[in-house]
């Protein structure tokens, strides 16, 4: 079942990533985002592979909100959300950048273009 488990984990992680990308997070706390992502992974039949990372602005990666984290997303923020789903120990890891400040549009697009070129 190894390949099937990887594929299922990847499908779940991808679905959750796309839902996260489309959602409006302005006004949400980082802890609320983490709770949402974790519940979406579990709802689809997987477990979280690691704590959800929610990194705001200059924080490059791997910030994990504490349960009572009061940091809130504003309309001028750039947030990176890193998530992982696991099925029977087989992990899919993915991330998405959500941008609310037009001055960062070209940066986000350049990163997306680099990712697509690498794949």
Where would I find each of the regions flagged by the language model?
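Active-site neighborhoods and metal-handling regions in enzymes and metal-associated proteins
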Residues: 1-119
